[in-house]
Amino acid sequence: GTMMTGCIEGSPLYRVAWFFADLTEGSFIAALPASIGMIIMGFVAAALERKKSAHAGTGVAGNGHIFTTMFVTTCLSLILGQLLYGGLFASGWIPTFATVLTVQVFVIFYGSDLKKVATSLILGTIVTCPVCYALLYGIVSPLGLPLFIAVSAGVAIVVPVCSLIFRLMPWMTIPAPAEGANPTDQNKSKFFVHQIFGDIGQLTIWGSSWATIGMYVGGIISWVMNPLHPAYGSGNFPLLIM
């Protein structure tokens, strides 16, 4: 499409568009307004979770205390992925989105200490993209399988492999779990509805009901402006959110 052509040509505008699309690619929306809505509401949810507000919904799955670090690290991984592997755009695809699923998990698991975050960012980004790319062209494409299998299988390989490597690094210790928001403080019926939205984005959008709602609102705005913008130009966005 137009975005891929622009990325191949090295257009900064389309590279930025690709960056934002990566943030909601896990939900198959991959649209700028959807990503912006998700980001805004993700920060709102994190703030409400930290305050233990009854309106927090699912918060950000108990990670409000490190949410800013999670988000910044995720963004840096997407930028680093483009810098390292941008030459692969010419092949028609680059799996930068996969680092959203790996680097973010490492930050949640190992904590927000600067040295740990830097290690998670660098190793996670360097390893994830090549593994997913190799799976795509070595197995997925030859067998005619859906592209997303390369990402999901790649993540399933990268997370345990990197975790084993981290064991060799003395500073990559696992911190004691922090206290998260208590869902019993909320109205049970309201929390049930929030949990449905939270489950949709359990891995890619922080398990946050508010972030998911923000993503859907942004996606709808994008679809109204151009029905072929969200959902990879398939025109199936209404079916995707139903």
Model-derived regions: residue spans:
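Pore-lining transmembrane helices
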Residues: 1-169, 186-242
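Short, Lys/Arg-enriched, Gly/Pro-containing loop segments at transmembrane-helix junctions
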Residues: 171-182
